[in-house]
């Protein structure tokens, strides 16, 4: 039911209240996501530990990869980068996270489909992902004890979701290929 509320907010407030298709100043999906994060912070940021789907799910939750990274960088006791799921687990979605951001493989399949159908071009997703890869690679090279590898950066969190599905929104993204690369 939370997803339905998010969709109603995204379409009703994020899109239609501004005049409908082509008139909205914000990405409606992102507006819906922000609405849900503000309205239901616990439900949007707490996930059952993988393999722990029992009647006691609320008591057995796992930290997300982003929560682990944040804890390590801030010096939280008992947190280590070794607590992160493997790159393969991040790829297939065997970790906690928000709806739409846990399985990098599913997101990449969505990207391939949209490129194949010519719904989007490669410019925006590739420029965003390449930029993050380069800068996170520099940080990892500087201090690999507190910064994760660029591959883990790409596979964890909402980066791919944003780069593939949100940044490519027709209304709120550039139209020229040069603009898309800079964006």
Regions found by a protein language model. Give the residues of each.
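Juxtamembrane/interfacial segments around transmembrane helices
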Residues: 9-16, 32-40, 56-63, 152-163, ...
